[in-house]
């Protein structure tokens, strides 16, 4: 099965299914000498893991990471880093009745037609459970980027259903179970989600991810432009149906005089482009947003077909997230980190000699 790896010089490959024995991955390209422990990776995994609130799936997985290789005496060796997370709370019996039925809005129908068979237990390979290894790999990239280059990556839930953040207080993001930056909306979020659970329905969300202190020059025009690669990596996250860089689709209503990010000796005057021009980082904050669809795993009856092309009524059972966007926050950070790490190594490999007398201007005035 192709499509299990991302990156060139910093390459992440994953394997495993939702109800399989374990999830695993291999991370290639990490420079030697980075101090890393399982506890370092566990921090982000704990932010992502299921069962932490009544608004995420109640599947209980500890997501305990094991480093199998590539680390010796607490430091990376420069060789492949092997990662493993055992699955401990599978309830495959929840899915026995749908082994011949296609859940609408899921990959059951497409996987079956592509491969001639499918793992119906929790979605198999198409389950968002696969992203646990991405988060672990992203933690390696995040630590390297911050320690050696001062690059910091953060994300938040900026919208859940109709409720939007009007204030972005990043200090509050880790203080609530929604990863929401506007504390004035927390009560409304709680009330909305309680109503949603009573209805047996789900809702979509928007996640914002920001990378700060990114150097000028990352990105490989024309097909590996940094924004194109970010869109690729973020779009690969389960349930993502849209990616915006900078102002995104708001640029439709902007005029050129408004949108252009003017330059001064003291820095850029704005950042409508989201930190990328012509596919190359500008040194400003890189800003991206992703739109996640509402999960189709809901208890409201719906229409579908089975493998015999017969009409059936579908009611999804099992343990599911009423809003997948909540746990997507650390996943978005991980994919941003993996992409920036790869392009940082690529720039260092191709253009280490490029230096300008005056250096880059600040990211903002």
Curated annotation (Swiss-Prot):
Keyword Lyase included in the entry's annotation: yes
Pfam families in UniProt: Chorismate_synt
Reported cofactor(s): FMNH2
The enzyme's E.C. designation: 4.2.3.5
GO-annotated cellular components: cytosol
Record-level GO BP terms: amino acid biosynthetic process; aromatic amino acid family biosynthetic process; chorismate biosynthetic process
Binding sites annotated in the UniProt record for NADP(+): 48, 54
Entry superkingdom: Bacteria
Metabolic or biological pathway: Metabolic intermediate biosynthesis; chorismate biosynthesis; chorismate from D-erythrose 4-phosphate and phosphoenolpyruvate: step 7/7
CDD domains for this protein: Chorismate_synthase
Class in the EC hierarchy, top level: lyase
Record-level Gene Ontology MF annotations: chorismate synthase activity; FMN binding
Cofactor note: Reduced FMN (FMNH(2)).
Catalytic activity annotation: 5-O-(1-carboxyvinyl)-3-phosphoshikimate = chorismate + phosphate
NCBIfam families to which the protein is assigned, alphabetical: aroC, PRK05382.1
The family this protein is said to belong to: Belongs to the chorismate synthase family.
Assembly: Homotetramer.
Known function: This reaction introduces a second double bond into the aromatic ring system.
Protein name: Chorismate synthase
Gene name of the record: aroC
